[in-house]
Amino acid sequence: MKRKLLLFVLCLPLFGLAQKEGNIWYFGENAGLDFNNGSPVALTDGMLNTSEGCASICDANGNLLFYTDGMLVYNKNHGIMPNGTGLLGHSSSTQSAIIVKKPMSNNLYYIFTVDDIFNTNGGAVTYSIVDMSLDGGLGGVTVDKNILLFNDASEKITAIKHQNEVDFWIVAPQHTTNTYYSYLLTSVGLSSAPVLNNVGSIPSNAGYLKASPDGTKIIAANT
């Protein structure tokens, strides 16, 4: 759902990134920010053209790896990755994509996408896997692409570091009930069966989901 409120900070990966993995942001209409030298430096070389959700990821030294609007995946040279088109996020989904590195892996990253709730599947949550060893180290989307987790999600999703400091919980609410779906991502892969929790009132269709730094609380901002 399109909103006339620019909350670009919330377009980006919404979990505690270690080291410098969140130091470069791409968002909006060809906009970006580089935080590697302390003060932010504006970037104008990005390829995104989106009013809402987007995500970027760097390596541990703050070097850009790739970024996405949930539909197209761009490598560090701003070219579309092999198999990097047709992901099932949406330019009018508030949290169209988040990126999570697979625990204990050097090359594999999960892109979790959320569709616009007004599309056919009503905000389907899907994931695709990027392998950074492909295309000469620039990365590519693997055959594990647009794997459905569940339908009827609101346009909210977040990732929370597990208490073991290695794994992640991927959390997203439905928009028709107060049910939150939580999937565990480990070095083995993503759990197929979610943990379901009914919490509070039914969330609004759009908005943002954010975890506290210690991972003990989440907040849903409705729009």
Name the predicted role of every residue range:
Residues 12, 59-62, 176, 185-187:
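Short acidic-glycine loop/turn motifs at beta-strand connectors
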Residues 26, 65-66, 110-112, 169-171, ...:
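Structural core positions within WD40/WD-like beta-propeller blades
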Residues 120-169, 173-174, 198-199:
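Asp-box/WD-like beta-propeller blade repeats and closely related beta-sheet repeat scaffolds
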Residues 40, 142-146, 190-196:
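Predominantly a core beta-strand signature of beta-propeller blades
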Residues 20-94, 101-104, 114-140, 165-223:
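Beta-propeller domains
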Residues 19, 49-61, 88-107, 149-167, ...:
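Structural signature of eukaryotic scaffold interfaces centered on beta-propeller domains
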Residues 1-23:
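Bacterial Sec-dependent N-terminal signal peptides
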